[in-house]
Amino acid sequence: MGDRYRRTRDYSSTDDDMELMIRPTKRRRLLPSRVKMLDNETAVETFGRLMKALSIQNGCSMELKLEDLSYFYNDNLEDSKQAVLRILASCVIDHPAHASAYATFVGLLNIGNFQFGAECVHFMMHKLRTSMEDNQWKNSHGIMAFIVELFNCNVVTCNSLISLLTCFLSECVEVEEGDEVSDIVPQARRDWLAFCVLSTLPSVGKELQQKSASFQGLLLTLQIYVKKRIPLHAAMLGIWNGGSGCAQMDYLDLLWQQVERLRDQQWLEPEHQLLQRPYLAFDDTLSAALQHVLPPLKMPSHTQISAYPPARVVFRIFDFFTCPDGLQMPPVLSVERHLLEVQIQEILKVHHLERKLCSDHLCNYAKSKPLMPVHFCIVEVILGEMLQLPTSPWITLNYGSILVELSKRQPDKIPMAVMQGADIIYAQLESMSVACFDRLVNFFSHYLSNFGFNWHWGQWGKGCTGASALNSSQMFSSGDFQTKTVFLRELIKKCRRLSYHLNMTQVLPENMLHFLPPPPHPQFKYIDELVPGAKLSQLLLEAMRGRRAEPTEISTILTGSTDLHLLKINVMTQVCLHIGSKSFTHTFATLTRYQTVFKQLIHSESEQHAILKGVFELWAGNEQFKYVVVEKLIRMQIVEAKYVVTWIFAPQLRVELTKMYIWELLHATVRTVKHPSRLLPRKRSPETVKALEEMDDTEVAVKGILLEIIHRFVKVLAGSTEGPEGSNTHYWCQWVQGRMQEFLFVYSEDYKKMGTKLVKISEESDLRKGVIKTIQAFLAYTM
Amino acid sequence: MSTSVDLSSYRDQHFKGSRSEQERSLRDSTTLYVGNLSFYTTEEQIHELFSRCGDVRVIVMGLDKYKKTPCGFCFVEYYTRAEAEAAMRFVNGTRLDDRLIRVDWDAGFIEGRQYGRGKTGGQVRDEYRTDYDAGRGGYGKLLSQKIAPNTDNR
């Protein structure tokens, strides 16, 4: 075995190695472990901390850290083996990109303590199996990466590792059509198994190729599997639809190509030390170790309740990209690109909740790779996760706050990368999925608001011929619904919501001002005495404003009026909103004061639509008020959620469907059904809240409203002619269809349970083709 | 190690109850205090920013005790602790209206707390400030009285 590590020395001979050769004479210990024995509990806690630190780039030598850890273990922890193994497992699960460091630690212990090595191997194999049984697929991926690295550290034998990999791939072996296995085992499971094996190959491929004759067969199995599989989900989950300049690939296809290229280069060591191999520094020591045979894995089989990690499409904006500072992004098909992404993703996953810490770690990581444009890759990974379909792992603001923080820390690098990324996305907007439109607008408006809305607006405005800020009453001209026009319009409105009208007029250049709607003031039409209802409005205004009339008095005035019932509702609504128009608080106060009056007036659908019409008329120029006031009316139980849905899809709101706020409102409406405890009255105990939200009634109501929404989508789309490409009607149909897909994505857990109902809808006769395709693709993806 | 959702060192001196009761309410609270706002920042802007962390239950604007105009702070209440934590994490220390705003746990809004506690009606910090802050009425109240005693009677 001795020559193994000596040979692998040629992977890299780094400064670190040199440092190690010099150091022993004047070694500075990181720990006082030899000085003082710690009590058990403190020792375990310290060990946990040090193990976590192995995944952190902080300038300390990895070798020193590893040596210290093994001394620390021998001095303090021999009796706490189970605790140590548990900590080890949690580390390898959280930090799969650092599996080699953890494996080296075990390798070092295994030399003097064969028993520990044996226990570790058995513990991890057990953990691998149980995590798969429990559907903890991400965990088993981390453990698998660790076990493979154990081979690199001379802890496990080559043959037993090959057996394990073969066992993983056994379900991917080509099956004849109609064969039972392919019927029962879903592709998601086989994809995941293949992914687990494939992702370990960059670090272990070379050794296995040299040592095992069966490795070729394994690669062949993978190749055939990947080439033959049909990634049906790719079209649906891609952020870019066909025709975009940005290449995007199914994650498994891409990884295969990256590994295949690596194999064709005789497993050339990835550049820039993207693969950590801390064990190389200990090769003499490790080569003396005895190895263990991995016990055979009894693979848990697929069951009815198994759920697998969803397939992904890899997001790319910086293809064939040379960064402004002359650094070259690793080519898309290089394994370097994959490794870079994986390591950035891991930092994000572990630290995303603490934006400052996360930024520190990302900056340190970038610093450790000065010859690579890591900043660009960080921006690409963050934007990619934020826009990910069907949904992003965390809220948009989480990603935005990290990018803002990074921009503050590295003002010469990150803002430029964000700018380039945004420019590329903007150029490709036409082919971007509607389902991530809102996330992009929300992110970007927030990002700009943190930097004084400073942007090269003029340049963006140039290519955009689309006309004015749309009012629902206006006729719209061609180009109004063009994606870029819609995007700029919505972006500028969102910026204004975070800022104020006057500021936007100062920030925007002349050629962009037409995107800014008029100041968002209320429009009280009953000021005109000739409008029907004006007289009643005068009486109400005078009573409410002049003498703060009681609800009973208002009811009397309304009863005394000879106006039609629906007109009365409209007048009453507009008067209340007009009086409260100063702020949300003022509006809510007025509505609350006269809540009983509204409840007497309003029961049926048409009556509820009348109050909504009142809101939309008075606040025609202020989308945020429309959305917030209607949501409040639902919470006050003056209006029912189901009638807000029918209102939104009513013919008179056709143009409004091209705007973001209406979807904001629709989502908020669904949330009120999902969380009935949030309806007034105010305070409820946590127990009542839980009981309310877990009620069967709630589930039925949620299903009801979500199904109703799909029905409405189908109906509104069926009633529209699509028109030629480039026409407003074409854009409109594409957009609304994209919104339907967004709903399926956001509430996929609920829609999954309504599979048969969705199938039924998709089989209706007069459906638009795109609608059928969207529903069917969703069903194929989730079932 | 400290995290963004830990309690800060600030304690409201007007809290009715013991220090440990206060800390318990802070730990369970879904209400946030938001400070260092511009006097011109509106409830609508605050709603826009904070609703990106979750559904906002209520916003109470901080007002000058005498003039009843915004005086640079507010309370934001969410439905759940998780939503409030998101605001602590992702909004605290970021910009609104070009100002770095402060977000901190609050034990819960009680009527009367919406008013500034300074002698002149605004927040105490705006009385002792020595810098010029256009978003918060220029110089601190005490200083501006010294500088221009005759022009402050508008």
From Swiss-Prot, chain B:
Domain RRM: 30-108
GO biological process, one term: regulatory ncRNA-mediated post-transcriptional gene silencing
Superkingdom, natural source: Eukaryota
Cell compartments where the protein resides: Nucleus
Cysteines joined through disulfide linkages: none
InterPro entries tied to this protein: NCBP2, NCBP2_RRM, Nucleotide-bd_a/b_plait_sf, RBD_domain_sf, RRM_dom
Alphabetized UniProt keyword annotations: mRNA processing, mRNA splicing, Nucleus, RNA-binding, RNA-mediated gene silencing
One Pfam match: RRM_1
Location (main, coarse): nucleus
Binding site for mRNA: 10, 33, 102-106, 113-117, 123-124
Entry's Gene Ontology molecular function annotations: RNA cap binding
Protein family per UniProt: Belongs to the RRM NCBP2 family.
Subunit comment: Component of the nuclear cap-binding complex (CBC), a heterodimer composed of Cbp80 and Cbp20 that interacts with m7GpppG-capped RNA. Interacts with Ars2.
Biological function: Component of the cap-binding complex (CBC), which binds co-transcriptionally to the 5' cap of pre-mRNAs and is involved in various processes such as pre-mRNA splicing and RNA-mediated gene silencing (RNAi). The CBC complex is involved in miRNA-mediated RNA interference via its interaction with Ars2 and is required for primary microRNAs (miRNAs) processing. Also involved in innate immunity via the short interfering RNAs (siRNAs) processing machinery by restricting the viral RNA production.
Protein name per its UniProtKB record: Nuclear cap-binding protein subunit 2
Source species of the chain: Drosophila ananassae (Fruit fly)
